């Protein structure tokens, strides 16, 4: 989850660069033809792990069947590309904001940043033990996933759970 914040920011940054290109009169970009389906949009795709896997599998199969030097190219409208990248970034951030926010019951909140090998969230309250990691919170704030209220809650939670005066500052995790 922590790095998904960065991926969302990267997509938004790419959309921003394409907006600049559009302002300079560029109306399309050329991509490998096999990449066009990756620009598909819509919550029906984003919300379905199965549909995302199908899209990825199709893309990978197309990559394998092409011979080096024979990549077909296609033009993609810059507006379509910008919209796709921005929509994907917005969806990722919204998903993290709503699905990964954890609270401790004492008024503190922060994002779960990682999952264990069994698919369980690592952060939050677990059997009376509070777990928080600073790295994922930094990504969420730095990459604009956390809204203003969430950023304040993260700071308060870090003060409560990660600040250690004897250590001279903030620990990376509880």
Residue locations for each model-derived region?
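Acidic, mature catalytic/reactive cores of soluble proteins
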Residues: 1-174
């Amino acid at each position: 989850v922590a790095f998904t914040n960065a991926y969302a920011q990267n997509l938004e940054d790419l959309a921003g660069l394409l907006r600049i290109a559009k302002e300079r009169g560029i109306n399309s970009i050329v991509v490998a033809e096999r990449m066009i389906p990756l620009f598909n949009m819509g919550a029906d795709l984003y919300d379905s792990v199965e549909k995302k896997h199908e899209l990825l599998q199709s893309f990978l199969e197309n990559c394998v069947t092409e011979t080096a030097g024979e990549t077909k190219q296609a033009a993609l409208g810059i507006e379509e590309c910008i919209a796709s990248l921005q929509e994907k970034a917005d969806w990722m951030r919204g998903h993290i904001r709503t699905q990964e926010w954890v609270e401790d019951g004492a008024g503190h909140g922060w994002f779960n940043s990682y999952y264990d090998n069994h698919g369980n969230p690592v952060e939050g309250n677990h059997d009376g033990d509070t777990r928080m990691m600073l790295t994922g919170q930094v990504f969420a704030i730095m990459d604009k996933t956390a809204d203003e209220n969430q950023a304040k809650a993260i700071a308060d939670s870090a003060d409560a759970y990660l600040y250690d005066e004897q250590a001279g500052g903030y620990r990376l995790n509880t």
